[in-house]
Amino acid sequence: MVEFVKICGVKTMDELRLVERYADATGVVVNSRSKRKVPLKTAAELIEMAEIPIYLVSTMKTFPEWANAVEKTGAEYIQVHSDMHPKAVNRLKDEYGVSVMKAFMVPRESDDPAEDAERLLELIGQYEVDKILLDTGVGSGRRHDYRVSAIIAKEYPIVLAGGLTPENVGEAIRWVKPAGVDVSSGVERNGVKDRVLIEAFMAVVRNG
């Protein structure tokens, strides 16, 4: 059963208020190539006003970069989409008390799901984080090989991301059996979070 739903990539107060009505958490993207990225100042404003956990999402790789972003935004939750060293992640947790979701990239198509899962499990084991996200790539809007994710989900309570939509999230949940799901472009219309799509997505997740 899915216990955690995150709707990521809010850019405005209107989007934040909409997402808050449905999701358990949201996210704001900074210092990234994503089309949903916002300035740190905007991120700080959204974080201050958020009534649900809001993750600071980025591809930043170093402790100084993350420390600066956390200090400027007041973030209590961060989502790391890079190969940041485990010791640097632990230092962020220790010095800033942030809750960390670490993203791990799953191949779009795997020639050997068991081998790819084993490689990722070994990598995941090096990190001490609060949530594990399996994704295709930050904000890629593309699905990955669920055969790999399903193996990992038997070992860890994972959050599943990557190309999820109201039409395919039910199948994804049945296949992978994740503890949580993370969606962004799948609930947008013309680049903006859409209430109808969010409601359709949530109906499948909660009742499917």
Curated annotation (Swiss-Prot):
EC main group: isomerase
Protein name (record): N-(5'-phosphoribosyl)anthranilate isomerase
EC number(s) from the headed UniProt entry: 5.3.1.24
Similarity remark: Belongs to the TrpF family.
Pathway membership: Amino-acid biosynthesis; L-tryptophan biosynthesis; L-tryptophan from chorismate: step 3/5
Keywords, sorted A to Z: Amino-acid biosynthesis, Aromatic amino acid biosynthesis, Isomerase, Tryptophan biosynthesis
Catalytic activity as recorded in UniProt: N-(5-phospho-beta-D-ribosyl)anthranilate = 1-(2-carboxyphenylamino)-1-deoxy-D-ribulose 5-phosphate
Single GO molecular function: phosphoribosylanthranilate isomerase activity
Keyword Isomerase included in the entry's annotation: yes
GO biological process: L-tryptophan biosynthetic process
